[in-house]
Amino acid sequence: MKLWVGLGNPEPGMARNRHNIGFMAIDVIADRHGFAPWRKRFSGLVSEGSVGGEKIVALKPLTYMNESGRAVQPASAFFKLPPDAVTVFHDELDLIPGKVRVKRGGGAAGHNGLRSIDRTLGTQDYWRVRLGIGHPGDKARVHGHVLGNFAKTDEDWLVDTLEAVSDAAPLLAAGKPEDFMTKVALLTKDTA
């Protein structure tokens, strides 16, 4: 069993924010892989299903981004999961839009959702699926960028990326992050 967490903010008006791409990815995975209906649990929304034969618990924290760990920690403790069974899908400023990278461990790089999870799990040794949203170029514009909505011109690459992540998800569930990244890249090569 694995816990896959999509990061985002729960306000309906923030649903299309760049910061919510983690929620979007988990929603597409749960939908396309036939997960059970979402229900409230662990200060979040939870859905269970199977990806590539692996049982997955999907979690969308309703704690707001900066307190995501308040949902992740109790969920991982309840299911008795070690940190390396947790995968967090999140927005990544340092990747161009549509680029996807997976890594285990590492710092929060200024991402408050990751910082909260690091603090509550007591470790950084969990998996991250970094979903590129691009950098606005000026550090002073970062806050407005991540909390801004995706533009209509982003729609093609965004939909293609989210569908590719879902289509490649069985490789991620099987513990093959390199193969997952390769498949996502191949599926999005004309749009990212």
Swiss-Prot record:
According to its UniProt record, this protein's enzyme class is hydrolase
**Where does the source fall among the domains of life?**
Bacteria
- Pfam families xref list: Pept_tRNA_hydro
- What are the entry keywords? Cytoplasm, Hydrolase, RNA-binding, tRNA-binding
Site positions (Stabilizes the basic form of H active site to accept a proton) are D91
Q: Which reaction does it catalyse?
A: an N-acyl-L-alpha-aminoacyl-tRNA + H2O = an N-acyl-L-amino acid + a tRNA + H(+)
Main location as per UniProt: cytoplasm
* Enzyme Commission number(s): 3.1.1.29
Gene3D superfamilies registered for this protein in UniProt: Peptidyl-tRNA hydrolase
Q: Name one GO cellular component term.
A: cytoplasm
Site Discriminates between blocked and unblocked aminoacyl-tRNA: give positions. Answer: N9
Work out whether the entry's keyword set contains Calcium. Answer: no
Q: Where in the cell is it found?
A: Cytoplasm
Q: Where does tRNA bind?
A: Y64, N66, N112
- Which residues are catalytic? H19
- Supply one GO BP term: rescue of stalled ribosome
List the InterPro entries hit by this protein, alphabetically.
Pept_tRNA_hydro, Pept_tRNA_hydro_CS, Pept_tRNA_hydro_sf
One example GO MF annotation: tRNA binding
Stated family:
Belongs to the PTH family.
Q: How does it assemble?
A: Monomer.
Function statement: Hydrolyzes ribosome-free peptidyl-tRNAs (with 1 or more amino acids incorporated), which drop off the ribosome during protein synthesis, or as a result of ribosome stalling.
What name appears for this protein in its UniProt entry? Peptidyl-tRNA hydrolase
Write down the species.
Answer: Acidiphilium cryptum (strain JF-5)
Name of encoding gene: pth
